[in-house]
Amino acid sequence: MMMLRIRSRDGLERVTAEGAHITVSQLKTLIADQLQIPLHKQTLSTNRDLLLAKTPADLLAFTDLTDPNLPLSSLNLGHGSMLYLAYDGERSIPGAPPVTPAGSFGRKMTVDDLIARQMRVTRQETSHCDSVSFDRDAANAFQHYVNESLAFAVKRGGFMYGTVTEEGQVEVDFIYEPPQQGTEANLILMRDADEEKRVDAIAMGLGMRRVGFIFNQTVVQDKTEYTLSNAEVLQAAELHAESELKEWVTAVVKLEVNEDGGADVHFEAFQMSDMCIRLFKEEWFETEIMPDDDPKLSKMKKEVVVGVKDLKEVDNDFFLVLVRILDHQGPLSSTFPIENRSSRATMRALKTHLDRAKSLPLVKKMSDFHLLLFVAQFLDVSSDVPALAECVRLQSPVPEGYALLIESMANTC
């Protein structure tokens, strides 16, 4: 016997099969029997992007599991493998037996009971963010560090900055990494208010704003059972709620085993659901996570309604709304040493950076967020920092006063 994990809009479920020798047709029959989804409504794929399909035409692009006679073993699927499922319509998910009526002839309902019945947790189908596009240099600088320097052994995070279009498309053009302490399971942000003021001043001059948070999961996390852990959901909800931006994006970088047995770096993007943010703001989440707690479940202080059940533990997948990922080449580079890492930026690094491309105008050399942040330490945060960043945005000549200051800084090493 083997177990296959099936991820759909309803979350993560499991189907039991005899073995990898069964065909796609037999698997669909098992899904119909065990998950109550009719055969003719099922679309299966090994590609997670299936869950982003919005129209029947979109579903036609996923053809890897359309041959009914194809054995699962030919796709290297086995015990514990993940498949993605889309289906039309609604289904009834089995729940707890009905409760006895409240009132004179049943159990009395408290005010908390009534509030809980109004707090119904359902899957949010549509995100407020149409897509998120990562600047290639910024994304590569982040993933390269967690892969090559940290070996995905500890967690690392950063705030994403960029723009949001009227259509809800988010573009990420730089990633700011605050002071932090990462372990195998937790990420503690030791935020520096003064440094964040400088970051926001640079963003203002560039015509950008904070649009999300990115972090990596570690190789020791048991990611076979969850997309985000309970601790990750809490942190993501806290930062999303703090932002007050409805298009706020949470991005995850992870290492996944490929078909050849090697490992690939993979990006995923989500929005925390409206209900998740509401529950966080109204303090329904249990914020103390115990060692024995199941990481795929978020604990509530009071019962909420999930399906037909009153529960105090909610599958984390109910709080996640998948977001489509794109990429682009933005206006900034990411070649200057990045803040708050083990190797710190220095005046010598500034001189090396400026000397590297002597033929370029200074504004081109300054078109690097991490360099702007380093220089911003020596400028007035309310006037000089946004003014210098605006020069970068407009690609206009850097005023002589700033140019002389930057040159003198570089020459002190």
UniProtKB/Swiss-Prot annotation:
Matching SUPFAM superfamilies: Ubiquitin-like
Residue ranges constituting the MPN domain according to the UniProt record: 131-272
Modification Phosphoserine occurs at: S104
Entry GO terms, CC: cytosol
InterPro entries attached to this UniProt entry: MPN, Npl4, NPL4_C, Npl4_Ub-like_dom, Ubiquitin-like_domsf
BP-aspect Gene Ontology terms: proteasome-mediated ubiquitin-dependent protein catabolic process
Pathway the protein takes part in: Protein degradation; proteasomal ubiquitin-dependent pathway
Alphabetized UniProt keyword annotations: Phosphoprotein, Ubl conjugation pathway
Family from the record: Belongs to the NPL4 family.
Chain's role: May be part of a complex that binds ubiquitinated proteins and that is necessary for the export of misfolded proteins from the ER to the cytoplasm, where they are degraded by the proteasome.
Identification of the protein by name: NPL4-like protein 2
Lineage: Eukaryota, Viridiplantae, Streptophyta, Embryophyta, Tracheophyta
